[in-house]
């Protein structure tokens, strides 16, 4: 049985990202949509895992290449926030790591501003689909942290319609 994926509108996503060049919302959405991170990975992401020189995010199970938009956002956030807390996504108010519920709420508000009825997992799935459109299964398995067999089972059907 195939999966159904709820995909965001690319133009709407780009407008949202343009409005949030380096805010927590901008970082959260870029990490999910452009880098394929899950909410828990976003919550736990620390500055020592962001390799600006190597242009990658080093997660425990994989390295994800930094997209230029994400790199620019994170560089600005690093200047503003890195000395306050080792976590990449912190609350602008409390200056403490943002809990998962707050990450979901901020992303939901930003996505709603453009009528996008998607969530962070949908953005991660869209990342995987876009990667599969331009890369082979082993590469996508490496950057997504998913097994090739899992990718094939879940995403093969949707590639027929992209």
Segments predicted by a language model, with ranges:
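Basic, Lys/Arg- and aromatic-enriched nucleic-acid-binding interface segment
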Residues: 6-39
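Short, basic (Lys/Arg/His-rich) helix/loop patches that form interaction surfaces
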Residues: 104-144
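Conserved tyrosine-mediated DNA breakage-rejoining catalytic core shared by Y-recombinases
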Residues: 35, 40, 44-74
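Alpha-helix N-cap/helix-start motif at helix boundaries, enriched for small hydrophobics
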Residues: 28-29, 40-45, 140
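Conserved small/polar residues in nucleotide/adenosyl-binding loops
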Residues: 161-162
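DNA breakage-rejoining catalytic core of tyrosine-based enzymes
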Residues: 1-13, 60-69, 82-86
């Amino acid at each position: 049985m195939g999966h159904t994926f709820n995909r965001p509108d690319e133009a709407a996503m780009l407008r949202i990202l343009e409005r949030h060049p380096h805010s927590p919302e901008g970082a959260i959405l870029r990490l999910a949509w452009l880098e394929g991170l899950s909410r828990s990975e976003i919550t736990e992401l620390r500055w020592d895992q962001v390799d600006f020189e190597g242009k990658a995010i080093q997660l425990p199970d994989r390295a994800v290449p930094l997209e230029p938009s994400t790199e620019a956002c994170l560089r600005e956030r690093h200047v503003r926030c890195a000395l306050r807390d080792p976590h990449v996504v912190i609350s602008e108010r409390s200056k403490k790591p943002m809990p998962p519920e707050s990450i979901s709420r901020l992303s939901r508000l930003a996505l709603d501003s453009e009528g996008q009825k998607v969530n962070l997992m949908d953005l991660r799935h869209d990342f995987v689909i876009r990667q599969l459109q331009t890369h082979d299964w082993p590469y996508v398995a490496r950057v997504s942290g998913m097994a090739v067999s899992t990718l094939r089972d879940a995403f093969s059907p949707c590639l027929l319609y992209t």
